[in-house]
Amino acid sequence: MSYVLNWDALVDEAVRRRKTEGLTQVQLAALAGVSAPTIISFEKGDKGLSLSKAIDILAALGLTEKNSSQTAQENFVSDAFERWLKLVEALPQDHPSRFPHGFVAYDYEIEGKIPSITLSEFRTNILEKAVAPFSGWPPFWLPTRDGLRPYVVDDVVECWIGDPATNRAFTDAAHADFWRVSREGRAYLQRGFQEDSEDLPKPGTIFDLTLPIWRASEVLLHADALASALKVDSSAAINFHVKYTGLSSRQLTNWAKPDRLPFFDTHRSRTNDVALSVRASVGKVRENIASLILELLQPLYEKFDFFRLSESLVQEETRQLISNARKL
């Protein structure tokens, strides 16, 4: 037996219940923890609305029970991934912007009291200040060109640099970033692997030794910079998460730095997805970056036939990264 959800009837019942309970759309938005425009879109029957936001609205009206096991950050990440899926759904399966060989997704939440700020102030005074040039392609970069620059979706600042309809200098998966940042100190970044460049003969077959250290460090330092720009309390913390997909059958190499630690044995992953996390104190990230990254990434490297990520390697790479920022 199969069941079909009558979405229109559910929306109608939600509107009826809101009016019966004497709630305005703004009041319902506050109860559900969503924006007023989201309520308006929901009541118009917009099927493009994320499922988690629809559930928030229905739960506020007593029409469904929200899964209490999922945290606010997990909801934020789910919404972000759903948005990305919607953006790429019309693209061919092998299009680089779909990350056909896998991707890495970073997300973080700043745990602490965050002051109220307008979206315009958030973009200009916070997001722009948080971008640090540790490399030529910094995370959460804010393009200014039409078609690439950030925009607002459901009170969240969003940017998709992988839009094939826009003329871009780089069209590979590693330069097709999708990111979202909220004024509540939540962020999500999804990016393809540089190792899957179209210039290489076999995308999806190698995993670089040093690139994960640089990329994770950049995003963690961005979280600390965002917290600083938001002027959060010094007792605040950053909960940082990374998920790698498409790792199965990849071989660990020194592709980005051929002179770094030559491999005499084959180190291959039989695991496809790896999820990692670390917790850091706001204002202490830069001074502890090597130890934080070692704690975060060691379980990832172990999936490649028990490869041991050495403390000295992480210290040297993070030292170079910090030094690189001073030169750029």
Give each language-model segment a name.
Residues M1-A9:
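A detector for short, charged/polar N-terminal pre-domain segments
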Residues D8, K19-T20, G48:
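Short amphipathic helical patch at the helix-1/turn junction of helix-turn-helix
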Residues D12-A29, D56:
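Short basic helix-loop element that most often maps to the first helix and adjoining turn
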Residues G33-L49:
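Recognition helix of helix-turn-helix/homeodomain-like DNA-binding domains
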Residues S52-S68:
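DNA major-groove recognition helix of helix-turn-helix/homeodomain DNA-binding modules
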Residues Q70-L328:
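Bergerat-fold GHKL/Histidine-kinase-like ATPase
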